[in-house]
Amino acid sequence: EIIALGRQPYTNWLGSLSKEDTTKIDEAIALTEINHLIYKKHDEISDGQLQIVLIARALAQDTSIIVLDEPTTHLDLVHKATLLKLLQKLAHETQKTILYSTHDIDLAIQMSDEMIVFTSNKIVQDQPCNLIQSGIFNSLFETEHLTFDANIGKFIIK
């Protein structure tokens, strides 16, 4: 049912799903590899699994751009990695633009084709390797307890 909600903007006034709607839902389930979850209630699955179900709902909507707000929040590292690898795979396989906000900059550097970085005085968009070379991450946080190591592409706690 959650995934079918992605098709709601396309249903008739009764909310009935068409054959095309059902096909889009089935495609989203297949792309996200969640067939084993389709008969479970949302309170029977983990937070990581729920995030993937919600991504399937977004895929079922079949838009060219998918915007996700902090999709890895409250997930452990394993589920974060699984989710980000899925997003990367979906972007490449479906040719959709997937834009997500995150505070997990280290993971975004590893997993993103491009990043948009907001600082206090500018907004910069580029590939992660170019952003590292530009030094943008060095000025991101004004604290003596954190530094960005460009050699390894990660923040280090001092």
Give the positions of each predicted feature.
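Catalytic Walker B motif of ABC-type/P-loop ATPase nucleotide-binding domains
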Residues: 66-69
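Conserved catalytic motifs of ABC-family nucleotide-binding domains
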Residues: 62
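Conserved ABC ATPase signature
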Residues: 41-45, 49
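Hydrophobic anchor residue at the start of the ABC signature
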Residues: 55, 83
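H-loop/switch region of ABC-family ATPase nucleotide-binding domains
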Residues: 102-103
